[in-house]
Each structure stands twice: as structure tokens, then as C-alpha cells.
């Protein structure tokens, strides 16, 4: 039978496996591709190929990540799996692979372990909105009470980090059985099929960038005689139409202006859309009233802030980061979208110093306000060199 051509008509959803080392994340990833290839007709990917994930760079950080894809009846899934714990930490903090939902793999034989907890915490900090649980290796547990106990522990852990533990779907099965095409007691293929159906029903369809409120980070500002001030940048999300009112947010007090023209490749358009590089003409705004590092946004949708809680990964020496630890009161530059702003770091109680290669929660206070919201990524730099990556976990003020 001829292979069907790739259809882009199904909604696209990004997921990934998280959980403790050796609980079966990669086996489940391989099993998902196998089951979906048989049931829904997508391509199968073998375990070894996923396990020897290639290195990639995100914001100058080396991360090993395997990307696979599979289809359900109604969706196309892109799935990330990381071989090592450090790769997960980096992946989630840099947003190299943003997840619309995560599959938490937990061994029924061992129950929740330190990285189970850490990955749930990271999911909360970086804004992974939904978690579905796969209790793996259930073929190795004969005791129904033990299974129930592990399930309760996982639910408690999810609730601890503000996920709806009581309502989280938990599928019990064996990834290895599913990978080998076995299905005793419906723990193999059936369980993985059930997992895919749960992803379909439990993770809502993500809002596309174009459907979100307009936002464009300003990269450059020009004044064109007789026309006024033009700011250029890449539209991050939404659409800006000519004659719409927009706000200029960040670095200075927020001001309102009107878009009087959109230009792309020297052509005049009536709108600029998510993903496009364009110039936006601003009515009545002077050249020195806007600067790189501010954003154009739909009025009322984003505010400037200076203080926030962040989850940060500090580059190791091998990654070109610092060679020495830093202490409280550390004052690097924080690079948001298009600009650096100096800020000071407050470390959690009991943490005296942060070593290269660590991840840490910190409270940052910037010297100038930046347009921000939870989930915004940033880099930490010293004199233009990246020494860390972070994500806004919670805005303080």
C-alpha cells in the first residue's frame, strides 16, 4: 500500500515524556510510535534511535533531545524525550521544546522518586499546563493494593505542585509489553492506545500564536521624513491591523499610539501577522520616544514588571558558562526578547551559592521594567556572554 502523503489538516499538539531515570520514558516513547503506526498509520521509531538522541543547541546550551511524531485519529503529536535528567532541566527552562502537555512516566514497582518530584515541580515552574500519568511496569506488580498506593502517592505529589491530582488521568500499563506487541490483561497495546485517547481528550487544543493578542518586540526604530516613526521586529503573536490602537510597553511608562501602516519587504500591507518580520508605522510617536527592548502590544494585554520569581539553569563551564559559583547579590544582565537589563538575584533560603551546571529558583529585581508574563524565557548574560537561561515562573510586582 502506498504511503499516504503528510496531511497538515489535523491539529498539532506538542507533548513529551517526563519522570525519573529508568522508569521507562524512552520505552514508552518508542511504544507510542509503534502502537500509533499500527492503529493510526503513522511511522514507527525504534528505541535505540530515540535513546541515542542527537545533541542540539538552544540559546547556546547543549541539550540531547529526541523528537518523534505520531498520529491519533484526530491529532498529530510532536513528542520530545530526553535521555538524561540534566537535559530535561535545560529543555524545560529554555523552552527548547515547549509542551502543551506532559506524560509523566512513573514505575509502578518503585513509585515516585526524586526526579518524579523534580519534573512535576519544573512543569509547574515553566508553565506546562497539563500532565497525564502513565504508571509503567505494571506487569511486575501483582499486588493491586500496591498499585493503588502508588497511584495515590502520584496524585498527592501532583496536588502538592498545584496540578489537579484528584482529576489527573492515570493509565496503568507496561510500555515494554506494548513495544513488543503484547497485551496481557490489556496492559500493553491497549494501555498505550488508551493513553493516546487520553491525550486527545484531556489536553485541550492549543491556541495558535496567530489567535493570541498582538505582541511585537521592537528591534529597531527609524524615522522616515514625511511619514513618521517606524519600528521593526518580528510579530511574536496575533495580528496588527492598520488604524488599530496599540500600546508601547516596557522600559518607560506605557504609552498609546496608532498603527498607521505596516510594511514588509518594502510593500505596504493592511496587517502584520504572527511570524512575520515587518515595520510598523506609529502615528504621532517621536523617534526618541521608543527604543529597542520595548514591545508593541494590543492595549491592556501585557504590563511592565521589575520583580519576578524565576527558574534558572546556570551553564556549566563546558557549555561556555562561568567557571566559578555566584552568590546572593549577583548582578548580571537579563536578556529579554531584544535587550539586556541589569538585575539582582535573591537566592532561596539556605542556598548560599549556585554552581555552574545547577538549576535554581531565584527572585530577580530588574533596574528597569520589562513587558512580561509568566512563561517568558530569558538569558542571563555577563558582558554579552550567555551564562544562564531562565523562565519567569511568577510575577511579583
From Swiss-Prot:
Q: Where does GTP bind?
A: 19-26, 81-85, 136-139
**One Pfam family this chain carries?**
GTP_EFTU_D3
Provide the E.C. number(s) assigned to this enzyme.
3.6.5.3
Molecular-function annotations in GO: GTP binding; GTPase activity; guanosine tetraphosphate binding; translation elongation factor activity
In this chain, the stretch annotated as G3 covers: 81-84
Task: Enumerate the subcellular locations listed in this protein's record, separating them with semicolons.
Answer: Cytoplasm
Annotated stretches, region: G2:
60-64
Residues holding Mg(2+): 26
Classify the main location. cytoplasm
Q: Where is this region: G5?
A: 174-176
UniProt enzyme class: hydrolase
Q: What is catalyzed by this enzyme?
A: GTP + H2O = GDP + phosphate + H(+)
GO cellular component annotations, sorted alphabetically?
Answer: cytosol
Q: Which UniProt keywords apply?
A: Cytoplasm, Elongation factor, GTP-binding, Hydrolase, Magnesium, Metal-binding, Nucleotide-binding, Protein biosynthesis
| Presence of the UniProt keyword NAD in the record | no
**PROSITE patterns reported for this sequence:** G_TR_1 (PS00301), G_TR_2 (PS51722)
Q: Does the keyword Lyase apply?
A: no
Every tr-type G domain range: 10-207
Functionally, this protein is described as follows: GTP hydrolase that promotes the GTP-dependent binding of aminoacyl-tRNA to the A-site of ribosomes during protein biosynthesis.
Instruction: Please describe the quaternary structure of this protein.
Output: Monomer.
Q: What is this protein called?
A: Elongation factor Tu 2
